[in-house]
UniProtKB/Swiss-Prot annotation:
The keyword Transcription does not apply. This is HEAT repeat-containing protein 6. Keywords: Phosphoprotein, Repeat. It holds the Pfam family DUF4042. Residues 313-325 have a biased composition (Basic residues). InterPro entries: ARM-like, ARM-type_fold, DUF4042, HEAT6. HEAT repeats lie at residues 159-198, 455-493, 517-555, 561-598. The gene is Heatr6. The modification Phosphothreonine is found at residue 621. The keyword Calcium does not apply. Residues 303-312 have a biased composition (Polar residues). The modification Phosphoserine is found at residues 402, 405, 646. Residues 292-345 are annotated as: Disordered.
Length: 1184
């Protein structure tokens, strides 16, 4: 089916609205005229031609303004019939029928079926070929309406339209005499490129033809025969065409030349018609990490006062010639803009001049009473900030072109509106370009669009910030900010290289310093834009852009104060009259407290008193009330939060936490209720988006700054309970998310590696009170809320964040409640709930108070095994993780003095767990990594009573084969690491027939292969560690096998620096440490028959081995690995143990191997002792 073009004034990418019903009179009129048209027969007489003319005129003049309602097939049939009645030699009738096609398809918004589309395209193409040139404009309009979104259905006509001598190619050529026809042809091409989701795209060769045509148009200057407005429309169509190719056509800009040429024309078009700016761009922009045009080093983000003053003076002169009509004329096309938003910031205005307290420079009156606002207007406006805005007197002007007249704006205003649309089109096209290329490619052009120094007016210094600060159209400013946000999104890795430096004596500016300067300049410009903007929509975009910048900038590598400036500037806007501004302000605050948390600078900001940085300003700049006016949270009786409701040692509470709590739970103030479009009628609370954002900020604080949040633990508990009692599922959900973050923060405090002093932790008895209140409140209801599975799943996650030390002290009924609910929800049909439940059970099974409960562990095992069979990969992945945890619990229970757990744990269940783990080891990597971990633990846990049973023999063999295949297969590195670790666990079980079983040689062969050749050094390390686990010589198998393992480790030591991946080098030392440990371990177990083989290896590689063992004795592992022997005494002791063992080995007379190996080890000890100044006994007491 073919979609058709909307009204010509709409952008060609805008989707068609659903047809609306015609009034009965209109419907009757259309049917009556259609019937008359169908009754006519082809006739070349003058009377017949006059009748067709009249009918066409009536059909064209019929009022279709209310939309569709006529059946699409009736419209298609009528248009086909109309074309059949008009021979191509009748130019006037052809022109009239094309007007009819254009009118009906635009106004009635019908879908032309494919056969009729084919006929109508054939007719219009023939008309272009045969009719007089004066008809081409109307024919092209009809053709544009027909091909709209139908490029893929015009395949047979594309050679005629877009071929080398195609009609559209000829008519759009720069050499064509009629500029209007040229523009209409480009419009047709743009419509051809537009595609509908789910339908085929325009074929690739034609995509490139169109792209090159559009690019040529954008690169070409305005011809002398073309007026400014037609030129703007031509540029708009070309930009829309490229945007359609990038969006719907999924065109990829793989060639640097194509991308560079496109970015060059987009940058030029971005500034098209911008007052006071006329830049010349190179034909192609080339990617470069440094500024392309000059090598200026970053300067301080401010200009001399004289520069600013001169700029202001010059602008003021131009300011006077702008008329009120002009401004209204431009405004006419900006339907979505606010009247007071068109103001600019002086490019030289420093951050200090921007007034950190939130007081800002404002335009003294809205457009219409003064001319175009300019730099000087903004700077001078500081003195007039108290003057009221006359926004209430503003009347919006219709956007229809026919409404323009000299009295309402004139041609100059109309032209400015079209120029603004070109800039907006260029920015929209740039946004599509950003989405169609990889970020690493985009960042090569960073310096072309993002400033790194205050702008000086040269072409290389203009950037997206130029538009944000200087463009008179709020919509264009918002578009520029959207593009900048898209560039900043996901830029964390790129920006992470930034580094501030105070070294000004370098001969060149390092890339890291350039990026740091760019980040500073973005902060400066965005804060300038913030204080100078009064359009709420654009203001929202500025704050969102700031939030994106804050989320990605590496503040831990930059000088302090950047976040402080953002923090102080944004504070007033959380009381703005527009709810979207308030929400985005909270989003920005959330970004500040979540970026690289915890940051010392943010920690200090959180401790600021409520009144810090707040001041009153004009009504356009919102402000916080004084501390006396702050909302206060009522004391909760049930939780006794008085002990923690305010910061200890602080005179005032954390203003951000107080703000968020009051936003969530207290009625809104009248001052903020004026434009809360999103709030429910009669609602006493802040709008939902505001409350949700406040809850997210609290969650960020709990995650990154728990030491601050913990002071409000009980009060936040009240907030969570209130949220979960509300009817809005989103509020409930975010309340539960906050609970989960608080629980995670409490757990983090009590981890063994926590650096929080015991006296600074929340006392366990208080955590018990907190969780008892949660479990006595609405949390159980949320857990059973089957109609809201997302809420249910989050409640399960929250339940898994209970501090283990507190769980054991909870009332017995609350413990039973948690366990019963989780085991019950494991049967849920919803995969989100089931995944969360599986994970929660995996957490509970590690709790010290539960892990020795055989019944609970068995029930959990059965629940997890059931989830491992689920269709959802996410459920299976969580279940496999929990199975790994459960098997960790089995291993922990082996070390307890009481053997009752092992005796009581069901052998049948153990068998079932092994079978499920084997099956899971063949699943996706997410499942497999934990399945092999579980297999290793299960095989380690097996008791002699299990191994002796015939039914276990086969499953043990299968389990080990599953591990071996995982070790050697090219799986994800995490999977192979876990498999090697699991193999080491298997080797720890003395009940298994390691050394005699057939699988022994396969297991060692797999591990030695990995330790020698695996690309990932962490996997090699784990393999070497596994090879040093067996504690008896017999477990290594035959003589040949022992020597193979020894030789493989020597080879691995020799290759320990052979890698092409730079990231692996940091693991080299740790790998050598583990290999040296394994070699010394083998020497400490070697038998007399093994020594000759070892001696042969030492003859070949003795010097290399000696140097690495000496290095091992001296420095040890550089990696953080729990299996490494770190202390010097322990490392030396390993050599002594090996030496003592070799000395005790009984060898045959004449065997020189024993003496050679002893001499090798003694030499190592001697050299080590000489270098470290120690004295060491080479022979033990048994040598006497």
């Amino acid at each position: 089916m073919a979609a058709v073009q909307v009204a010509a004034s709409l952008p060609c990418g805008q989707p068609r609205e659903a047809p609306r019903e015609l009034s009965p009179e209109q419907d009757d009129g259309f049917r009556r005229l259609s019937a008359r048209l169908r009754a006519l027969q082809p006739d070349d007489s003058t009377v017949s031609r006059m009748e067709i003319h009249l009918l066409f005129d009536q059909l064209i003049s019929e009022n279709y303004s209310e939309g569709g309602g006529v059946a699409p097939e009736d419209v298609s049939a009528l248009l086909v019939r109309a074309c059949q009645l008009v021979p191509l030699n009748q130019n006037h009738l052809v022109s009239k029928v094309c007007q009819l096609i254009h009118r009906l398809l635009n106004r009635l918004q019908v879908v032309v079926d494919e056969p009729n589309l084919d006929f109508l395209l054939t007719y219009t193409i023939s008309a272009l070929q045969q009719c007089s040139s004066w008809t081409h404009m109307e024919i092209l309009q009809a053709l544009a309406a027909l091909v709209y979104c139908n490029g893929s259905k015009c395949q047979k006509h594309l050679p005629d339209l877009l071929g080398k001598s195609g009609l559209l190619m000829k008519l759009s050529d720069l050499s064509h005499s009629d500029p209007e026809v040229r523009r209409a042809a480009v419009h047709c091409m743009a419509n051809l490129c537009l595609s509908v989701p789910g339908q085929p795209y325009l074929e690739e060769p034609y995509q490139h033809v169109c792209f090159q045509a559009f690019l040529t148009i954008l690169q070409s200057p305005k011809s002398s025969d073309m007026d400014d407005i037609t030129f703007c429309m031509l540029l708009q169509n070309a930009l829309k065409g490229i945007q359609s190719l990038l969006n719907g056509g999924k065109m990829r800009l793989t060639q640097t030349e194509h991308l560079g040429a496109l970015l060059a024309v987009l940058k030029k078009a971005m500034f098209h018609g911008l007052p006071g700016l006329n830049i010349e761009m190179p034909a192609v922009l080339y990617p470069t990490p440094l500024p392309q045009y000059d090598g200026r080093s970053p300067v301080k983000p401010q200009q001399p006062e004289s520069t600013t003053a001169r700029s202001s003076a010059n602008k003021k002169k131009k300011h006077k010639v702008k008329t009120k009509k002009t401004q209204q004329g431009e405004k006419a096309e900006e339907e979505e803009e606010e009247p007071c938003g068109e103001v600019e910031a002086a490019p030289g205005l420093s951050m200090d001049q921007a007034n950190v307290s939130g007081e800002s420079a404002w335009c003294s009156s809205p457009w219409g009473s003064q001319g175009l606002p300019v730099d000087g207007g903004r700077a001078a406006g500081r003195e007039q900030a108290s003057l009221p805005f006359a926004s209430s007197s503003w009347k919006r002007v219709s956007s229809s072109e026919s409404d323009y007249s000299d009295a309402e704006g004139g041609m100059q205003g109309k032209m400015r509106s079209y120029q603004a649309k070109v800039r907006q089109g260029a920015l929209a096209c740039f946004l599509s370009t950003i989405k169609s290329i990889e970020k690493k490619v985009l960042y090569g052009y960073w310096s072309a669009f993002v400033p790194d120094t205050p702008e000086l007016g040269s072409p290389q210094s203009v950037s997206l910030m130029t538009l944000t600060l200087k463009d008179p159209s709020p919509k264009t400013r918002a578009c520029a900010l959207q593009v900048l946000s898209a560039i900043l999104e996901g830029s964390k890795q790129f920006l992470s290289v930034a580094e501030d430096t105070s070294d000004h004596k370098r001969a060149f500016t390092p890339f890291s310093v350039t990026i740091a300067s760019s980040i500073r300049e973005l902060h400066r410009c965005l804060l300038l834009a913030l204080v100078a903007e009064s359009s709420s929509q654009t203001l929202t975009q500025i704050i969102k852009c700031l939030a994106n910048l804050v989320s990605n900038a590496p503040y831990n590598r930059l000088k302090l104060s950047l976040l402080t400036k953002v923090w102080n500037h944004i504070k007033p806007y959380i009381r703005h009259k527009d709810v979207n501004v308030r929400v985005s302000s909270l989003t920005l605050l959330g970004a500040i407290v979540s970026t690289h948390a915890p940051l010392p600078e943010v920690q200090l900001l959180l401790q600021q008193p409520c009144s810090s940085g707040l001041s009153s300003s004009s009504s356009a700049t919102p402000h916080l009330s004084t501390p006396d006016g702050w909302k206060t949270f009522p004391a909760g009786s049930s939780l006794e939060e008085a002990s923690l409701s305010s910061p200890k040692g602080s005179s005032e509470p954390c203003w951000l936490i107080r703000l968020c709590i009051s936003t969530v739970v207290l009625p809104k103030e009248d001052s903020c209720s004026g434009s809360d479009a999103g709030s429910a009628l009669g609602s006493t609370y802040e709008p939902s988006p505001m409350r949700l954002e406040a809850l997210q900020v609290l969650a960020h604080l709990a995650r990154g700054y728990f030491s601050t949040a913990q002071l409000y633990l009980m009060e936040l508990g009240e907030v969570i309970c209130k949220c979960m009692c509300e009817a809005n599922p989103s509020i409930q959900l975010h309340g539960v998310k906050l609970l989960e973050e608080l629980g995670a923060g409490l757990i983090q405090q009590y981890k063994p590696d926590s650096n929080i002093a015991p006296e600074q932790r929340v006392p366990v008895h208080l955590v018990v009170v907190f969780w008892t209140a949660m479990l006595s409140g609405p949390l159980p209801r949320a857990l059973q809320s089957a109609e809201h599975p997302t809420l249910q799943a989050s409640a399960c996650d929250a339940l898994s964040s209970i501090l283990p030390e507190a769980f054991s002290s909870l009332p017995n009924d609350k413990q039973i409640l948690c366990i019963t609910v989780l085991l019950g929800l494991n049967d849920s049909k919803n995969h989100l709930v089931k995944a969360a439940t599986s994970r929660a059970l995996g957490v509970y099974v590690l709790f010290p108070c539960l892990r020795q409960d055989v019944i609970f562990v068995a029930d959990t095992a059965n629940a997890i095994l059931m989830s491992l069979q689920d269709k959802s990969l996410n459920v299976r992945a969580k279940a496999a993780w929990s199975l790994g945890n459960l098997t960790d619990t089995l291993i922990v229970n082996m070390d307890t003095p009481d053997p009752s757990f092992q005796d009581e744990f069901s052998g049948l269940l153990l068998l079932k767990m092994l079978q499920c783990a084997i099956q899971a080891s063949t699943d996706k990597d997410k499942v497999k990594s934990n399945a092999v971990r579980a297999l290793g633990n299960l095989l380690h846990f097996l008791q002699p009573s299990h191994v002796e049973r015939p039914r276990f023999a086969e499953i043990i063999e299968e389990s080990i084969q599953a591990l071996i295949s995982t070790v050697v297969n090219e799986a994800a590195m995490k999977v192979r690491w876990n498999a090697c670790y699991a193999m080491g666990n298997v080797f720890k079980n003395p009940a298994l027939p390691l050394g005699t079983a057939p699988w022994t040689s396969q297991a060692y062969k797999a591990l030695t292969s990995v330790v020698m050749s695996c690309k990932n050094f962490k996997v090699r390390i784990r393999s070497a560690a596994a090879l040093s686990v067996p504690s008896k010589r017999g477990q290594y198998g035959s003589l040949e096998q022992f020597i193979q393992i020894w030789s493989a480790l020597v080879t691995a030591l020799q290759k320990s620096e052979d890698t092409t991946d730079f990231l692996e080098f940091k693991y080299c030392a740790s790998l050598r440490t583990h290999i040296c440990q394994a070699l010394l371990h083998l020497l400490s177990l070697a038998s007399a028959s093994d020594l000759p083989g070892i001696q042969e290896t030492l003859k070949l590689h003795g010097d290399m081995i000696r140097s690495y063992i000496l290095q091992f004795l001296k420095s040890g592992a550089e990696g953080d690995d729990p299996g490494a022997v770190h202390t010097p005494q322990e490392r030396v002791q390993m050599v002594r143990v090996a030496l003592k063992h070799i000395h005790r080995v009984q060898t045959l007379a004449g065997d020189t191997a024993r003496g050679a190996i002893m001499g090798f080890l003694e030499d190592i000890l001697t050299v080590h002792c000489d270098s470290s100044g120690e004295q060491v006994m080479l022979r033990g007491p048994s040598d006497q």
